[in-house]
Amino acid sequence: MKESVIRKLEGLLERNEEVLALLGDASVIADQDRFRALSKEYSQLEEVVAGFKAYQQAQADLESAKEMLEEDDAEMREMAQEEIKAAKVELERLEAELQILLLPKDPNDDTNAFIEIRAGAGGDEAAIFAGDLFRMYSRYAEANRWQLEIMSSNEGEHGGFKEIIVKVSGEGAYGKLKFESGGHRVQRVPETESQGRVHTSAVTVVVMHEVPEAEAISINPADLKVDTFRSSGAGGQHVNKTDSAIRITHIPTGIVVECQDQRSQHKNRAQAMSVLAARIQAVEDEKRRSAEESTRRSLVASGDRSERVRTYNFPQGRVSEHRINLTLYRLNEVMEGDLDAILGPLMQEHQADLLAALADEQG
């Protein structure tokens, strides 16, 4: 392992010990904000520190085995050779793990996420599939113990959604879901198809990270056009009595957000503003990412919603992830929320890309 990497790991080990000592300090325990921040830092350091300690132990085992080679006993020397071989394999494995753990973290990975699902080409069938994707993400959120809240929805005439925006709250939500952005294509026989022909429909998914209030971008009220209208969604007679639905247009960017799922206009406005902030931030993030990644690919899809990332073929029970040439014949499980079978390999490929970029930067 490079000396510069060893020095970095030694610094993290030292910092881990400092944080542990601070967490036992009475003044820190009394300051809940500082205690929470240090606890979070400690948990973030824990995995890499444990990996480095294991690496140091494997290094010590290797040196000890090398010393055994000086023994007169032939059997001891043979045993030493085996131990040297095992220690080298372990060191190689731990070094690879540590390289991944040291990769620069996306600061937004631990934030909540907004998922926008929009029916594209395919009419009613596209709307129905948008509903299927919403159900898939709901199941995945449930499996991860995340909370899911519908921010805005526009139902399809024959089921599903023309558009739905949901907020997913929970640790690591954006970090996992960000790979879902892009075009999702479905191939299946619609229920309304009497000839049994397979139709192809498309749905676009955009995943954005929530912008914490403390980091919220400044939105000038003068740049906003706010319209109120009567909700067209569920709500019984109430929807006919008040203009509780909100449409906010951000004039400089042309971004439009509608929220009508809450009975209160105040709540709809608050939800619309949080989605608007996320969309504006997503535009800024994309500009920055384009500048940084102009020379290499990214598995986190760009703002180009036409970019096809995945195909769901129902007659064959097949899911094809186009970014990494992954094909799985377990469509039912995926539609029931077993997304880790796809997101895991995507994450690994993303890490490999980051490692390659890091190696290029280091010469």
UniProtKB/Swiss-Prot annotation:
Its main subcellular localisation, reduced to a broad class, is cytoplasm
Record keywords, A-Z: Cytoplasm, Methylation, Protein biosynthesis
Q: Does the keyword Cytoplasm apply?
A: yes
- The answer to whether keyword Repressor applies is no
- Where would one find coiled-coil regions in this protein? none
Any single Pfam family the record assigns to this protein? RF-1
- In the record, what terms sit under GO molecular function? translation release factor activity, codon specific
N5-methylglutamine modifications at: 237
Query: How would you describe the post-translational modification of this protein?
Result: Methylated by PrmC. Methylation increases the termination efficiency of RF1.
Region feature (Disordered): 284-306
The biased composition feature labelled Basic and acidic residues covers 284-296
Got a GO cellular component term for this one?
cytoplasm
Q: Which residues cross the membrane?
A: none
As for subcellular location, the record says:
Cytoplasm
What this chain does, per the record? Peptide chain release factor 1 directs the termination of translation in response to the peptide chain termination codons UAG and UAA.
Q: Which family does it belong to?
A: Belongs to the prokaryotic/mitochondrial release factor family.
The name of this protein is Peptide chain release factor 1
Q: What's the source species for this entry?
A: Shewanella oneidensis (strain ATCC 700550 / JCM 31522 / CIP 106686 / LMG 19005 / NCIMB 14063 / MR-1)
